UniProtKB/Swiss-Prot annotation:
Component of the eukaryotic translation initiation factor 3 (eIF-3) complex, which is involved in protein synthesis of a specialized repertoire of mRNAs and, together with other initiation factors, stimulates binding of mRNA and methionyl-tRNAi to the 40S ribosome. The eIF-3 complex specifically targets and initiates translation of a subset of mRNAs involved in cell proliferation. GO terms for molecular function: translation initiation factor activity. CDD domains: eIF3E. This is Eukaryotic translation initiation factor 3 subunit E. SMART domains: eIF3_N, PINT.
Amino acid sequence: MADNAPPSADSAKTPEEIIKEYDLLPKLIPYLDRHLVFPLLEFASGQEETQESIDEITKSKYELLKQTNMTDYVANLWQEINHSDTIPEEFVKKREEVVQRLQQYVEDSSKITELLQDDNVVGNLRSDKVANLKFLEEQHGATVDMVNTLYDYGRFQYSCGSYGNAAELLYQFRVLSTDNDKVASATWGKLASEILTTNWEGAMEEVQKVKDSIDTRLFNNPLGQLQHRTWLIHWSLFPLFNHEPARDVLTDLFFSPAYINTIQTSCPWILRYLTAAVITNRQRVHKNSSLYQKQLKDLIRIVRQEEYEYQDPITDFIKALYIDFDFEEAQKKLGEAEEVLRSDFFLVAAADAFVESARHLISESYCKIHQRIDIKDLSTRLGLSQDEGEKWIVNLIRDTRVDAKIDYKEGTVLMNHPPQSVYQQVIEKTKGGFFRTQVLSAAVAK
C-alpha cells in the first residue's frame, strides 16, 4: 500500500525551502563570540537574493557590532541602513575616545612591552611565572599592574578588530600572569583572534590549551565543563573545515566520550558537522584504515540514538543508507544535503568532497548486497547519466580492488562476494559490544 502512496509534501520542497528549514545560524550564534558571528552574517548576506533580506542582515551586523570599538565600520553600517552620506556626531565622538584610549594603552604598556621585546630579558625568563615576575620587578621595575595592562590592552585591540595585535598582547600577558581566571579568558581571546586572522596552526594550539584548561580548571564543576565544551565545539568548527591537519584531531576530539556526550546533551546539531567530517574523510589518506571504519560505525550509532533529537538531510543520508538500507531515500537525501552544504558557512567548501564520498558509500553498500548490478539502475541512484555511471563504476572497481566483472553487452556488473565465515561474523558483532562496554566503563569510572 505504501508503495502506491502519493509523494509527500516533503519530496516537493524547493531548494530554497530546504535551505531555510535547515539553517543552523540561529542555533550557532548563542555559542559564538560576536566577532566570530560576523563572518557567518557576511556569508549569509552573500547567499540572499532579495534586497529586503540583505538589508535585514545589514541591520543584524549593526546590532552585533555597535557595542564594539570598530567605530568606522559601525558608522558605515549606520549610513547604509539610513541611506545617509553624513556620520552622526555620536560616532565621531566615540572614534575620538577610542583613539585616545589606544594612545593611553600604548603609554601604559610601553615599559612591559619593551622588556618583552628585549632578547636579553626574554632569555632570562623561565617556565616559573612567579619567578619571572619577581625577576622583572627586582631587575626592571615591572609590576603586576603593568602585566594586567597587557590583558586590558589586548581586549581593547580585539574590540577594535585588530585581531593580530590582540593575539600578541594576550600571548605576552599569558607568559607572565598568575591570575588563572584572566589567563583562561586570554586563551579564549587568543583562540578567537587566531581564527579571525585565519592562523589555523595557532588556532589549533589554542584549542588544545582551552581543552586542557576546561579539563583541569573546571574539574569539580561538571556544569561549567559542559558549557565550556559546548563553546569550544562551536569555535572549533572554524579550523575543522579550513585546516587539513585539524580534521583528524578535531574529529577524534568530538568522538571522545566527554565531547560526544556534550554534543548529545547540549548541541545535537553539531552532528551535521561531525557527519560531514567523517564522510569527507573517506577521500583522505586513511580512507581504508580501521580508524575510518570505526568512526563511521560510531557515527551510525550516534545518528540512530539522536534520531528524535536532531535530523537534517546530512544525518538523514546516514540513516537512509546504513540504518534503513533505503538506497532511493539515500539518493534523495544526498540531493537535499548538497543544497544544505552549499548554504552552510562551514561546509560550503566541503560540498563537492561530501557528494563524491557519499556516492562512493552508496556504491559500496549497493555492491555489497547485490550479486548482479544493473549499471543504468546504479547510475540513477547516484544521480549520474549511464555513461557517467559506467565510468564511475570502472573507477570504483579499480580504486577499491573489489572482485567484479563488467558485462558491457548486458550493461551489468557481476560481483564475486566471498562467503564470510561464521567465525568472522562473530568477530564483527562482538566488536560493537566491546566498544559499548568501554564507553560504559569510562562513564562509571567518572
